Amino acid sequence: NAYVDENSPAVMNFTKADSMVAYAVENGLSIRGHVLAWDADMCDWFFREGYKKDGAYVSADVMKNRLKMYIDEVMTHFEEKYPGAIYCWDVVNEAVADNAGEFADDDVRHVRQVRGGKTNLFYDYIGSDYVELAFRYAYETREKLQAANSKTNIKLFYNDYNTFATYGANKRDAIIQLVKSVNSFESDGNGGYLKLCDGIGMQSYIGGYGQQSGCMNDNDITLVKNAIEKFAENNVEVHVTELAVRNYDNDAEPEHAAFYKKLAQTYVDINKAAQAAGKTGPITSLSIWGLFDAPYLSTADYSYKMNGPYCGLFTELYQPKQSFKEVYEVLAAE
């Protein structure tokens, strides 16, 4: 297996992922690849000799090669087996820290060194430029695959949450600095730089976390709008990912519907304004995380806090809510 070193006999297993991708292809669904590098969800043994829990940590050079080969193998597997099915890969997920003390003081990118008290192993064993390197590796594989098959058309994205946050450490602006760094990392040989990152994925959990207070706040729409426009100024696309308009009170459905309508209209207006200026609308994809209500969730459940039990456009019985009707009318008018 190409991504392992001489002491590493590990083999990739795509069985579960293949079953999901095959189902999507059979049903005419496009796929977002998520995610190639994420510090929160990569096993410690990935960084050790022989991929063994008790192995010594490998050198930075070995880890760079390991990450490169891992990214290449994953992307190549799915593109060769399901040509054209994947429209985008989230190359790196949630690498920007939320708070001071979680990143180096002199790092304008705010690349996280710790998460919840645990160190970022990519940062520790590859280096502070692991994000840029991951994008370079993904770009090289993408170019190889596109040269081999005209069906391949993959965009490379950086994905994160709280992307519209300007409080505290100002995550929005740090994300911009990170993407700037990625897109000025590799020379194109002609005095410019290769555009390694095509866009920013905006995880969009909007509203109070785990509580009704803070939900359906129009100021959040303003922050979202400002963030999208800032990202577009830096010549990248925007994908709205994991959209969930939080709502913890079923009786607040009228307010939820009105807020969803304003949000949908804001997305439309942003693209229309760009088009009126002779540009392409920056929002090129939208994925809804909270599509259906889930009133059965316990208040202690992570999904209860993250999404809200009444965040859906549909009820738990798959019936369209007023929120769906309002969003549909906004989109149908375009």
Predicted feature residues:
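Aromatic-rich peripheral "rim/lid" segments of glycoside hydrolase catalytic domains that contact
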Residues: 4-8, 15, 77-80, 84, ...
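Short glycine/serine/threonine-biased micro-segments
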Residues: 31, 199, 288
